[in-house]
Amino acid sequence: SRGNSMTNAHGVHILADYTGFFPKLDNTGEWILSLMEKVVDESTANRVHSHIEEFDGTSSPPGFAAVVLLDESHLTAHCYSEKGWLSIDCFTCGSTNPGAIIDAMHSAIQEASPGIKLEKRKTEARFTNG
C-alpha cells in the first residue's frame, strides 16, 4: 500500500531495540550522548540541541534518556541499565539518511558492549500524506 512505500514518504523513522547492553564504561549515558552528537555531526543532519537525563533508580529504574534534536527531526536513546536494554531511534525528513546514523551508532555500541544483541530493527515511512 502507499502508506508503506518509502518513495512516497517525506520522512523515515528507524527504531532499534537491543538487549545485553552492559558496556564497561564509567558514564554510559554521557558516552552515548557524545556518540550520538559525533554520529550526527558526521552525517548530513543538522544538530540543534542535545540533552541527557540520567536516572539513578530513585523514582524510576536506573538508566538514561538522551536526545539530539535535529533540524530534520531527532535521534534518541533510552536505556534500562540494570536490564541491559537499549533502544535507539532516528527520524529524519528530507535527504538525510537515518539508516546511516543508526548503522554508525550500531557499530560503536557493538564495539563498546560485545555481548549486545539487536532484537529488532524497523523502518517506518513517515509523512506519507502526499
Predicted regions and their residues:
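Polybasic/polar functional segments that serve as interface/processing modules
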Residues: 2-130
